[in-house]
Structure formats: structure tokens, C-alpha cells
Amino acid sequence: MRRGLVLAAALLLSACARPGALPASPVPAGPGITIAATSIPLNAQDPAQDRIGDFRYAGGLALSSPDTSRFHGLSDMALVAGGALTAVTDEGDLLRARLVLDKAGRLVGLTDGRITALTNPEGRPLQGKLEGDSEGMALLANGDMLVSFEQRHRVWLYPAAGPPRPAPLPDATFPDNGGLEALAPDPAAGPDAYVAGGEESGQTWTCRVSTTCVAGPVIAKPPEFGLVAVTRLPKGRTAWLLRAWDPVRGSRVSLVVRDATTEIARMDLARPLAVDNFEALAAVAAKDGTIRFYLLSDDNFQSSQRTLLLAFDWKPKS
């Protein structure tokens, strides 16, 4: 028996003597992450295609991160000067990153990635889908951020400093998974104003942090499409993002630009074009009047879907 114990001890020491394999490079600690970006064509079957009607393709990326499992479910975003991007996820995370453009202004990458948890008014991270299903966001001019949530329907104001607090919510009933997907600042209505839209109904509201919400127009859409994002544009125009999915045709997306009464421009994305579950929309106006639109997709944490970020340029005719 003693001989057996000696042999067992020798085998144990031999097993412990070998160190485990180390990563090829250091693994980051903290919120900073690497964002891998692979350029994709607008149409994989026709890589030369660079337009959809009046919209010119300005680059597209398939995004992922080797550093975290939290880089998924991106459901809305906002952009500010210098290409700083802020996005929220379906599970209560906040992503910050910066766009990378080449010399021609085409989208080629994303850098300076950071992921942190959204918190509740007590300062604790949101827990689980029921509490953290953030779907819409709006960055106000003073740096405050508004976030709309599904499941437990609410809008919270995240001040530039301090804990979040409830913000006005439209007086309406929403399905569990069909709340205020569309949210954006509405500066023409006031410095603390935001426009909100119901996914299934297409009903919109103009809200103010300091007062309440007032019903606006209902966005016309086919019944299979949901209203998922909105952004105000110069000259009183608004861009709306509509999304549909079925197992035969897959994802379909329409970007619609309207003024108060008229549809001005429209871009439809469907197979074989680069399309996925686009839920986020942002716009940047250039000095010559061109509008750069960015569309970001929510992969639903599914390996069969992708996180895509596409850029399109549109120049109004007037």
C-alpha cells in the first residue's frame, strides 16, 4: 500500500508541475474591450453595388469582441461630435466606443470600446432581462441620457452626474416585448424634450422631463413592421426605422424620412443585401447638407445573427 501511495504522490506532483497554457496576449481587466470589425459589402452577391436609390453606401462592419460575452444585443445608439458612440443593450449594459473613418470618410472600424452596467436608482447594476431590457436611448444636449425599457415599461433619466430617476412615460399600455423602442432627443420642442414611439402601434409622443407626454402622429406602416428607432433631422424632418421578420424572408428594414406630412425618401433593406435585426439609428449632418445615417443591429445573443453597423449618405434635394 505504501508503494502505491508513493506512486500516486509522484503522479500528482508530475501533474502539478506543468503550468497551464497562457493567453497569447494579456486579457484586459475592467470595462475596456477590443472591438473586432470586419468590413462587409452592401451586397455579397454583387460587391460593386454601392447605392440603394438616393442612399450611398459608406461602409459596413460585422462587429464582435474577443474580450467579453456582453457585446451582444445592441438595441439603440447615439452619436456626438467626433464620432463618440453610446449604445444600450437588451441586458442592461452601456457601450461606449468611437467610430473610425478612413480618409474618404468611409466607416472602417470601432475603437476605445468600454462596457459598463446600467444601474438602478440605488446604484446597483440592473439584473436580468426583466429589469435590464433597455431598448431606446436619447442623449440630451446637457449630457443627460434617457433610456426606455421593455418588460417593466419605464423611462429613466440618467443625469450626467448622479443616480437615475424616473422620467415621464406615455399614458398607454404596451405589450411585454413591444414597448417604447423608438426614443430620441426632440430639441425643437425644448432642451429637455424627447420623442418616443411604440413598436407595435406606431403611436408617437413628445415628452419633456419637466412636464409630461403629449400624443403625436401615428406612423403609417404595414402591420408586420414595428417602429424601432427615430432621429430628428434638420429642416423639421424626421427619420423613422421600421423592422419586420419572418422565417421565409428573414429580416427586412425600412428607413423612412418624412416631414410633417410627406414621405421624402425611403431605403429598404432585404436579402441579398446586408441585413439583420436593425434596431438602432443615428444621423450626423454635414456642412453641405448631406446626412450620414448609421444603422446598428441587435443579434439577440444568437450565433445565427450578427451585430452589423452600416453607414449610408443621403443628400436632400432641397
Regions found by a protein language model. Give the residues of each.
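Positively charged n-region of N-terminal signal peptides that target proteins for export
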Residues: M1-G4
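Bacterial N-terminal signal peptides
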Residues: V6-A15
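Sequence/structural signature of beta-propeller domains
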Residues: A15-S318
